Amino acid sequence: MNVIDLFKKLLSFKSVTPDDDGGMEFIKEYLKGFEVIESEKEGVKNLFIYKKFGEGDHLCFGGHIDVVPPGEGWNTDPFTPTEKEGFIYARGAQDMKSGLAAFLWAMKNAKNFKGTLSALITSDEEGDAVWGTKYMLEILKDKNLIPDYAIVAEPTCEKVFGDAIKIGRRGSINGVLKKIGLQGHAAYPEKSINPIHKVAQVLHKIAGVDLDDGDEFFAPSKFVVTDIRAGMEVTNVTPGELKMMFNVRNNTHTDKEKIKNFIHEHFKDMNYTLELKQSAEPFVTNPDTKVVKALDRAIKNHTNITPQHSTAGGTSDARFFAKHGVKVVEFGVKNDTIHAPNERTTPEEVNKLADIFKEVIEEWN
């Protein structure tokens, strides 16, 4: 089975998160001869496949078999991979069954690796991500099987295949600020405290503001207001409370305490409450580490492109590897149609991705 046949087989599983639709059993059979550790909790399946070839490094490939629901607007059946006009169309074509097929094929066909080679695959990356990679890594920790290095095969490339490696990710902090006012009649504003008017006075000072200067790896952390609600949808009552929701995609220079102080600085003269939740921690892998250099070389060899080292974009399961001290990076196909109708990629990208992963494995030692 070549990598394109494997890719199409994986695309045919209707693995809408957290259902794997039998895909995990197929993968176990495909890599028969590898050791297997499995977990299943709250409908989420995780699969860790590994083989020890020698006493060298433990290199792990990470990925997910689950996909988002296909939605409307497709010109083909989203779970029947369709090849036309130089593309393969199906849900998960870019995110991320291309990456999954590429590293599974590479693991099966690569030679001369002298350490431990593994793959951690979950059916819960697109969902809540509570019982997926995060949970499985705790199991591996108890078994002393945490890898030294990891490559998560998420789609990372922007304009052309090979142009970007993710060497880190920003974190994500969500906030809810409630401004307490005093409800009253719109005809007597002097008898009420209108939280809309109060917040409006400072909103232009905080919306879109950079909270730090960033650094060589990260853009500045930015304060982004995402929702403001107040009132009862009537014109003659001023509201008694306003709720403002916001998000900060934070780098390593901004944390919850810094955001708390930023809010207090601007709202200290007002009656308010604040809730902050860190849903993802930021991380960065040094570009001089072995895994980054290995990917750089292989990408250059197969595309003649020197990839950019990026930390842009949202969160991914790579953050869970980083929390265990794993030197982790991400690399995969282009990401221009992820989660969209008519998601697609090219056979050329999938073939090159598989060859790159194979070279990384074979040239590792």
Curated annotation (Swiss-Prot):
Active-site residues, Swiss-Prot/TrEMBL: D66, E125
GO molecular function: acetylornithine deacetylase activity; metal ion binding; succinyl-diaminopimelate desuccinylase activity
Cofactors demanded by this protein: Zn(2+); Co(2+)
Record's keyword terms, sorted: Amino-acid biosynthesis, Cobalt, Diaminopimelate biosynthesis, Hydrolase, Lysine biosynthesis, Metal-binding, Zinc
Enzyme Commission identifier(s): 3.5.1.18
Enzyme class: hydrolase
Coiled-coil ranges (or none): none
Residues the record lists as binding Zn(2+) 2: D95, E126, H339
One Pfam family here: Peptidase_M20
Binding-site residues, Zn(2+) 1: H64, D95, E154
UniProt-listed InterPro entries: Bact_exopeptidase_dim_dom (IPR036264), DapE_proteobac (IPR005941), Peptidase_M20 (IPR002933), Peptidase_M20_dimer (IPR011650), Peptidase_M20A (IPR050072)
Cofactor notes: Binds 2 Zn(2+) or Co(2+) ions per subunit.
Pathway: Amino-acid biosynthesis; L-lysine biosynthesis via DAP pathway; LL-2,6-diaminopimelate from (S)-tetrahydrodipicolinate (succinylase route): step 3/3
Free-text function comment from the UniProt entry: Catalyzes the hydrolysis of N-succinyl-L,L-diaminopimelic acid (SDAP), forming succinate and LL-2,6-diaminopimelate (DAP), an intermediate involved in the bacterial biosynthesis of lysine and meso-diaminopimelic acid, an essential component of bacterial cell walls.
Similarity comment: family membership: Belongs to the peptidase M20A family. DapE subfamily.
Cross-referenced PANTHER family: ACETYLORNITHINE DEACETYLASE, N-ACETYL-L-CITRULLINE DEACETYLASE
Subunit structure: Homodimer.
The protein's name in its UniProt record: Succinyl-diaminopimelate desuccinylase
Organism of origin: Nautilia profundicola (strain ATCC BAA-1463 / DSM 18972 / AmH)
Gene responsible for this protein: dapE
